[in-house]
UniProtKB/Swiss-Prot annotation:
Protein name, entry field: COP9 signalosome complex subunit 7
GO terms classed as biological process: red, far-red light phototransduction
UniProt keyword terms in alphabetical order: Cytoplasm, Developmental protein, Nucleus, Phosphoprotein, Phytochrome signaling pathway, Signalosome
Keyword Repeat: no
Family statement: Belongs to the CSN7/EIF3M family. CSN7 subfamily.
Post-translational modification: Phosphorylated.
Cellular localisation: Cytoplasm; Nucleus
Biological function: Component of the COP9 signalosome complex (CSN), a complex involved in various cellular and developmental processes such as photomorphogenesis and auxin and jasmonate responses. The CSN complex is an essential regulator of the ubiquitin (Ubl) conjugation pathway by mediating the deneddylation of the cullin subunits of SCF-type E3 ligase complexes, leading to decrease the Ubl ligase activity of SCF. It is involved in repression of photomorphogenesis in darkness by regulating the activity of COP1-containing Ubl ligase complexes.
Record gene name: CSN7
Presence of the UniProt keyword Phosphoprotein in the record: yes
Top-rank taxon, per record: Eukaryota
Transmembrane segments: none
Length: 71
């Protein structure tokens, strides 16, 4: 499970459309809201914010709730 999330985050951070198409069967389908939240977390992570701060930016009260939503 953690490996799948790691692949997804790496794809969002460094991947291309072609990378997504090649890996689409190995990563979970995301809704438009989940995609925007993934991109938001990556943008915030660049500024070295704490995980809890990142989760509050996407309206998550608990860090674990945020992880579940991003899956």
């Amino acid at each position: 499970q953690a490996e799948i999330i790691d692949q997804l985050v790496r794809l969002f951070a460094h991947g291309t459309w072609g990378d997504y198409k090649c890996n689409a069967s190995r990563i979970p389908q995301l809704s438009p809201d989940q995609i925007l939240k993934q991109l938001t977390v990556l943008t915030l992570a660049e500024s070295n914010k704490k995980w809890a701060d990142n989760m509050s930016e996407i309206d998550k009260k608990e860090a674990e709730e945020g992880v579940e939503e991003l899956k």
